[in-house]
From Swiss-Prot:
L-methionine binds at E56, Q99, D250, K281. Residues 99-109 are annotated as: Flexible loop. InterPro entries: ADOMET_SYNTHASE_CS, S-AdoMet_synt_C, S-AdoMet_synt_central, S-AdoMet_synt_N, S-AdoMet_synthetase, S-AdoMet_synthetase_sfam. It catalyses: L-methionine + ATP + H2O = S-adenosyl-L-methionine + phosphate + diphosphate. Its EC number is 2.5.1.6. Its cofactor is Mg(2+); K(+). Homotetramer; dimer of dimers. The gene is metK. Mg(2+) binds at D17. The keyword Magnesium applies. Signal peptide: none annotated. Belongs to the AdoMet synthase family. This is S-adenosylmethionine synthase. One of its GO terms (cellular component) is cytoplasm.
Length: 396
């Protein structure tokens, strides 16, 4: 029997990098509420007493970015100076330019239109906002077709926030991290080997109180008991103290949790982050589309695991390459799957935006606890509406 361990991590909404992601996506949502055609690339830095929002934004609407930043920080829970960060007293600095005209011309009129070898329809006219490769992944390990380690890590992180905000564990503060190690046997998850939870807390609570509270009210409600046994290891605040947290403890930046945002390291990653980017940026939109493709292939029963790669050239509408890897679990060959993808999915940027209805203020909600496998949200890239057509196309 082949056994191996695989580990994934998540972070809470109060983690400094996630504060930055949430502010960037809150700004994007605020702009999209007024101008769905805006071009947005919004980056955020948070540190002790300071928020810096910078980027390239092209829009005719006005958004009060400092107000958006403060409200986001307030909702996360940094509402008092003794937490090390305060939504009302921190400084908020903005530095915003318009999108580069050199980039804009390639997005506004794709190479296919400029050189007149493409159609003059609206879906052909929009070029990719950058070069790069994006990956999507799906697996039968969980009902949401996500890897079990990242699924459990996200659920533990979300539960930490829930018990803090409901005051079930009133001594918790916003910053926190989770990590789950799952043991696999012949490619199937069989048990949880290790759980690590680090959570910011009130200075006068004891470590024993934190450990017992977290195990009882965070771990037990989240991790299925059949995955726990007498050998499962639990590490709760293993440094012994986590009072200084959030931006006071670490500087946070947009886009530094790309593995947390996706598949917990189980799949490859093209390197591009999501938050603060409008959907003409294929780092975001094509990653969502790639998940849509991979999930439908797995939902169709064509493979137990599927990784899909798509790649683009800046200013060009059509992808330059596509690749499917089923890791030996496919019921049809991978070349056939690529052919089926080309038949059933239009992966030009404008087509992705239209198919997934991405010019809406839907991004703040996915800026924490993962962009994929979110059964708590109605996300278009999580639909499996093309599974039956793929199954028929494969002759199954």
């Amino acid at each position: 029997m082949a056994r191996r361990l695989f580990t994934s991590e998540s972070v809470t909404e109060g983690h400094p990098d996630k504060i930055a992601d949430q502010i960037s996506d809150a700004v994007l949502d605020a702009i999209f509420e007024k101008d769905p055609l805006a071009r947005v690339a919004c980056e955020t830095l948070v540190t002790t007493g300071l928020v810096l929002v910078a980027g390239e934004i092209t829009t005719d609407c006005y958004v009060d970015i400092p107000r958006v930043a403060r409200e986001t920080i307030r909702e996360i829970g940094y509402t008092r100076a003794k937490y090390g960060f305060d939504c009302d007293t921190c400084a908020v600095i903005t530095s915003i330019d318009e999108q580069s005209s050199d980039i804009a011309q390639g997005v506004d009129r794709a190479l296919e239109v400029r050189e007149r070898y493409g159609n003059e329809d609206e879906l052909e006219a929009t070029g990719a906002g950058d070069q790069g490769m994006m990956f999507g992944y799906a697996t039968t390990e969980t009902p949401e077709l996500m890897p079990l380690p990242i699924s459990l890590a996200h659920r533990l992180a979300r539960r930490l926030a829930e018990v803090r905000k409901s005051r079930l564990l009133p001594y918790l503060r916003p910053d926190g991290k989770t990590q789950v190690t799952v043991e696999y046997e012949n490619g199937r998850p069989v048990r949880v080997d290790t759980i690590v939870i680090s959570t910011q807390h009130h200075p006068r609570v004891t470590l024993d109180e934190i450990r017992s509270g977290v195990l009882e009210h965070v771990v037990k409600p989240v991790v299925p008991p059949e995955f726990l046994d007498g050998s499962t290891r639990f590490f709760v605040n293993p440094t012994g103290r986590f009072v200084i947290g959030g931006p006071q403890g670490d500087t946070g930046l947009t886009g530094r949790k790309i593995i947390v945002d996706t598949y917990g390291g189980m799949a490859r990653h093209g390197g591009g982050s999501f938050s603060g980017k409008d959907p003409t940026k294929v780092d975001r939109s094509a990653s969502y589309a790639a998940r849509y493709v991979a999930k439908n292939i797995v939902a169709a029963g064509l493979a137990e695991k599927c990784e899909f790669q798509v790649a683009y050239a800046i200013g060009v509408a059509h992808p330059v390459s596509m690749m499917v890897d089923t890791f030996g679990t496919g019921r049809v060959d991978e070349q056939t799957l690529v052919k089926l993808v080309k038949e059933h999915f239009d992966l030009r940027p404008a087509a992705i935006i239209k198919e997934l209805d991405l010019r809406r203020p839907i991004y703040r909600q996915v800026s924490v606890y993962g962009h994929f496998g979110r059964n708590d949200l109605d996300l278009p890239w999580e639909r499996t509406d093309k599974a039956e057509a793929l199954r028929r196309g494969a002759g199954l």
